[in-house]
A protein has these predicted regions:
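Alpha/beta-hydrolase fold catalytic core
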Residues: 1-47, 71-73, 289-295
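Conserved HGGG/HGGXW glycine-rich cap/lid loop of the alpha/beta-hydrolase fold
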Residues: 31-83
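Flexible "cap/lid" loop of the alpha/beta hydrolase fold
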Residues: 122, 130-161
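Conserved alpha/beta-hydrolase catalytic His-Asp/Glu region
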Residues: 142-144, 163-226
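Catalytic histidine-centered segment of alpha/beta-hydrolase-like enzymes
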Residues: 244, 265-281
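Active-site loop/oxyanion-hole signature of alpha/beta-hydrolase fold enzymes
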Residues: 76-108, 112, 282
C-alpha cells in the first residue's frame, strides 16, 4: 500500500513532520561481524542518549524523543539487527557507541527496549551513565511456556493472518488508549503502525524478539544485586493501567531497582510518551540534569 494511501486520514501537518524527519535523519550502517546494523546518529551536546526502540525495533520509531532532545544531546537510535541473541544485540550496541567515539550514554529503553536496556547495562556497565526504563518489566521463567508456544505457532502463520494479529495486539497496547482519550495523534499512530505492519519484515521482527525472550526466560533472572558495583542512577516511568505490564510485573521491576526514581502516571496505559508527552519529557530532562549535576 502506498504511503499517501496509508496516511490519508492523518492531518497534513503531522504527515509533513514525519516526512521532514525522514529527510533530515538518514540511517548510518555498521557491519559487526557478519551482521549489518542501521542506526540514527544526530544531535549535539556533551552528553549522549542511546534510545532503544520497543516492539517495532526500528530507531525511527523513537522520533518524538529524538526531535525533543537532539538540540541538547547526542542521539544514537539503533534498529535492532535480527537473528541475534540478546548478548549479540548488546554487543552490537556497544560497537555502535565505539564507532561513534562515545564512551558513555544515558540509556533509555521503552517496552521491549527496556528489556534490552536492562541486559545492556549488565553486560557493559561502564558504557551506561544512567538508565531510563519506560513501561517495561523483568523477564522471569513464567514467560517461558507462552513464549515457546508463540515460537511454535506464529512462524507458520501466513502474512494475511499475521497482519490482523499484529494490528490487534498493537491496538490493545497503544491505539485503544489513544482513541479513548480522543488524542489528536490517534490517526497518525494508527497509520504509522499500519505502515510497519504492511512490511513483511515485521513478522520476522516479532519472531526474532520471541526467540530472544525465550532464550532469556531460561537464563538466570535479573536481580538487584547485579548492579551493586554500578554507580549509575535509574528512572522508572510506568502507568497504573498499562495493559502490557501487569501490577506484579511493575512491582518486580521496582524491587529489582530499589533505589530508582519512579514516576507513575494515571490512565496513560502503555502510551504515556504520547498522552503525557510534555510531562514525560520534563521528567526525563530533570532526571538527566540531576545525574550530570551529581558528578
Amino acid at each position: 500500500m502506498a504511503f499517501d494511501e496509508i496516511y490519508r486520514k492523518v492531518p497534513s501537518e503531522q504527515v509533513a513532520r514525519l516526512k521532514e524527519f525522514r529527510l533530515n535523519h538518514p540511517y548510518k550502517q555498521l557491519i559487526v561481524g557478519d551482521t549489518k546494523w542501521e542506526y540514527l546518529s544526530c544531535g549535539q551536546g556533551e552528553q549522549t542518549l542511546l534510545l532503544l526502540p520497543g516492539a517495532l525495533s526500528v530507531g525511527e520509531s523513537t522520533f518524538p524523543l529524538i526531535t525533543a532532545f537532539e538540540n541538547d544531546y547526542r542521539i544514537i537510535a539503533p534498529s535492532y539487527a535480527l537473528s541475534l541473541t540478546m548478548a549479540g544485540l548488546c554487543r552490537g550496541l556497544a560497537n555502535i557507541l565505539e564507532t561513534e567515539a562515545l564512551n558513555q550514554a544515558h540509556v533509555l529503553g521503552g517496552s521491549y527496549g527496556g528489556l534490552v536496556a536492562q541486559y545492556f547495562v549488565r553486560q557493559y556497565p561502564a558504557r551506561v551513565r544512567s538508565l531510563i526504563l519506560s513501561h517495561t518489566f523483568v523477564l522471569t521463567p513464567k514467560y517461558a511456556k507462552p513464549l515457546w508456544l508463540a515460537g511454535k505457532v506464529f512462524p507458520a502463520f501466513p502474512q494475511s493472518l499475521v497482519a490482523p494479529i499484529l494490528k490487534l495486539r498493537l491496538n490493545k497496547m497503544l491505539l485503544s488508549t489513544l482513541s479513548n482519550a480522543n488524542h489528536p495523534e490517534t490517526e497518525f499512530w494508527s497509520a504509522y503502525l499500519d505502515e510497519a505492519i504492511a512490511s513483511d519484515l515485521l513478522k520476522e521482527v516479532f519472531i526474532h524478539q520471541n526467540k530472544c525472550l525465550l532464550d532469556l526466560a531460561h537464563q538466570r533472572q535479573l536481580t538487584s544485586d547485579d548492579l551493586k558495583g554500578w554507580p549509575g542512577k535509574v528512572l522508572i516511568i510506568e502507568s497504573d493501567d498499562d495493559p502490557a505490564i501487569r501490577v506484579r510485573d511493575r512491582e518486580l521491576l521496582r524491587s529489582t531497582y530499589p533505589k530508582a526514581q519512579v514516576h507513575t502516571f494515571c490512565d496513560a496505559g502503555h502510551a504515556s510518551s504520547i498522552l503525557k508527552r510534555e510531562e514525560v519529557f520534563l521528567i526525563i530532562r530533570s532526571f538527566l540534569h540531576n545525574v550530570v549535576q551529581d558528578v
